[in-house]
Amino acid sequence: MVSDGDFYRQYLNGDDAGLEALMEKYGDPLTVYLDGYLHDIHEAEELMLDVFAYLFTKKPRIREGGFKAYLYKAARHMALRHRSKRRLMFSLDALTDSLPFQ
């Protein structure tokens, strides 16, 4: 059986099939995990793609056997940042809506 680390190394060696296999394996569960933070399935799907895009562009070093933990930790940090930005945006919208017209 091929491990997550094998798929990731395959991708790092230039074979995109490794990343595709990881996306196939973790895409849906990661989306559900992110939806738990965002409470919006569409935003969760977009953020899941952002997590994999991060892996695609940055190609971080991940210790052996730690791919899943790394993936979910990165997803959690991205979700918390996204939620924080969304909360700030809503706060600013509420502030501007409450201003009287001059």
Model-based region annotation:
Residues 22, 26, 30, 51, ...:
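Residue-level preference for hydrophobic side chains embedded in well-ordered alpha helices
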Residues 1-29, 36:
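N-terminal module of bacterial RNA polymerase sigma factors
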Residues 12-13, 49-66, 85-87:
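Sigma70-family region 2
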Residues 94-102:
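Acidic, proline/glycine-rich intrinsically disordered inter-domain spacer in sigma factors
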Residues 73-93:
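Arg/Lys-rich amphipathic alpha helix in sigma70-family domain 2
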Residues 42, 65-69:
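Conserved catalytic/ATP-binding subdomain
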